[in-house]
Regions:
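Short, compositionally stereotyped local motifs that mark structural "simplifiers"
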Residues: 28-116
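Bacterial signal peptide processing site
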Residues: 22-25
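C-terminal motif of bacterial Sec signal peptides marking the signal peptidase cleavage site
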Residues: 17-20
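Bacterial N-terminal signal peptides that target proteins for export
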Residues: 1-11
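GH16 jelly-roll
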Residues: 42-44, 48-52, 56, 78-81, ...
């Protein structure tokens, strides 16, 4: 039975092949393969000679790869995922690839801003002259939204500006730029006595990112039980390689003063996370209070991360690729900025009867400088 079927199949295939070869005008042709459109490099001005670079291709669905050191990009080069800051002398090269197409030609552009070290090159000063509470700049900030964030057992619902989803109230936003010139990130309890909480988590993902330099934010933090403010960064490539491979840089994390881990003193923490790579060092000088205004910053150079409070010379934590176990992800590409105020979670614990609502995280500015 099987042999007979095989013989019949062979006969049929022979017929197909013979038919396919017959006739001069009836034969098939191999489709001509097209080339993906070369990337377009566009720039917008940042500050003091720095620019924000974005890449695009006219080929629908194209994936873009780029380098900044003048080397020829390939599919193993960093994938372009968001606009990035250029504040140093670089040669950006990019290609586009798309299914069914050959790779594009290389697009190249050199940047020679020659900006001195310590120069302010990007910032959000949260200025507001409208006379009313205003939306955080939508060209800079977007939002994570919803519940059960991040695997931390947090309790809040994160709300975007203008959202009426779930417990969110657009008339009482959780993130706004006040007439006082500060960004307000507000944790609220819409109905007193319930375990329903709202807050905000702002991010520059897809809008702004940078690699290397110094970033700092001047902030005043809430101290109530269950509050968990943070100022941090994640790799642009989180969507393609996930966390923790993308890398996480925690410029600041703080939990309530009553937590047993605090051992009677107030503190903030600067951390790094990657694949099999973790580090966290606390800053707790005498009489330090996170409820007062302080500037929290990070100095990012190749192979090294440093954290400081109030002055770049006041470094309290240093992490290096040469001394840490695991995979160091912080030389692999740009990262985007996040600021949020979590409620509850595995680290701070839940709010209790002493917790003050609303609790507010105030941000005076976020600034990026050259090293």
């Amino acid at each position: 039975m099987r042999a007979g079927a095989a013989m019949l199949t062979a006969v049929l295939l022979s017929g197909v092949l013979l038919c396919g070869c017959g006739g001069g005008s009836g034969g098939g042709t191999t489709p001509t393969q097209t080339q993906a459109a070369a990337p377009i490099i566009a720039t917008t001005a940042a500050q003091n000679g720095a620019v924000i670079v974005s890449l695009a291709s006219a080929t629908s669905g194209a994936t873009l790869y780029y380098t900044v050191d003048g080397s020829t990009p390939g599919t193993s080069s960093p994938q372009y995922l968001a606009p990035f800051l250029v504040a140093a002398n670089l040669n950006v090269k990019a290609i586009a690839t798309a299914s069914g197409d050959t790779a594009s030609s290389v697009t190249s552009q050199s940047f020679t801003p020659n900006i001195p070290s310590g120069t302010l090159v990007w910032s959000d000063e949260f200025s507001n002259s409208t006379g009313a509470n205003a939306q955080p700049n939508p060209l800079v900030w977007t939002y994570d939204t919803g519940t059960d964030c991040c695997g931390n057992n947090e309790l809040e619902t994160y709300c975007a500006w203008g959202s009426s989803a779930s417990s969110c109230n657009p008339a009482n936003p959780n993130a706004y730029v006040g007439t006082d010139g500060y960004l307000h990130i507000v944790a609220q309890q819409p109905t007193a006595g319930t375990a329903v909480y709202t807050s905000a988590r702002l991010k520059t993902e897809g809008l702004f990112s940078f690699q290397y330099g110094r970033i700092e934010a001047r902030m005043m933090l809430p101290e109530s039980q269950g509050m968990w403010p943070a100022f941090w960064l994640l790799g642009n490539n989180i969507a393609t390689i996930s966390w923790p491979a993308c890398g996480e840089l925690d410029v600041l994390e703080h939990i309530n003063g009553s937590n047993p881990e605090n051992e009677g003193f107030d503190w903030v923490q600067g951390s790094v996370h990657g694949t099999n790579l973790n580090g966290g060092i606390q800053y707790h000088p005498a009489a330090f209070s996170a409820a007062a205004w302080h500037t929290y910053g990070m100095i990012w150079t190749k192979g090294q991360i440093q954290y400081y409070v109030d002055n770049p010379a006041n470094v309290y934590a240093t992490y290096t690729s040469s001394t840490m176990a695991g995979t160091w992800p912080f030389d692999s590409g740009p990262q985007f900025v996040i600021m949020n105020l979590a409620v509850g979670g595995s680290w701070p614990g839940s709010p209790d009867a002493t917790t003050v609502f609303p609790s507010t995280m105030l941000v005076d500015y976020v600034r990026v400088y050259t090293n």
